[in-house]
């Protein structure tokens, strides 16, 4: 199949984001991983944190590709202003899952499109409700290692899907890139 490359740089190494874009026949011209500081500033709420990280990923990529449009994104999980990033280890992943057990939480993705002085950021929140998890379910899930490199320690598109009682909002947002908003952002600049 002949894939038409679209005129933008995707500032993300996430295989999930690449796959989501490819699913709707969007193929970035360049894929670049921006290495930036993603530490949480104690004064930032989840939306400010996520927007800052997405924007900084785009700005870092603009340093390398100053003539290109840059698409970047950051996904976090939050509940009551507590931010859950990617767990550092299995123990932290277990803590996250215990916290989400039987509760609602939010998945937030900030998508940024940048070039020169143009910086547009879209924020998309999806509410996710987990069923109550027992110890065995958590241990079983942790043994899959699916929790690695996932905000909030789970992947809705994988084994953890059976834990999710309901979602309210964008499914693709929970995977890592809200496709409706991303498509419209790219389309607004004539990139697709």
Please report, for each region that a protein language model flagged, where it lies by residue:
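Short loop/helix-cap segments at secondary-structure boundaries that form the rim of catalytic
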Residues: 20-23, 41, 63-64
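Anionic-ligand binding patches
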Residues: 2-8, 44-192
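Surface-exposed, flexible loop/turn segments at secondary-structure boundaries
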Residues: 16, 37, 119
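N-terminal beta1-alpha1 ligand-phosphate binding loop
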Residues: 3-26
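Cofactor-binding loop segments of dinucleotide-utilizing enzymes, especially the Rossmann-like FAD-
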Residues: 13, 34, 116
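A short beta-strand-loop structural module common to alpha/beta enzyme folds
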Residues: 28-39
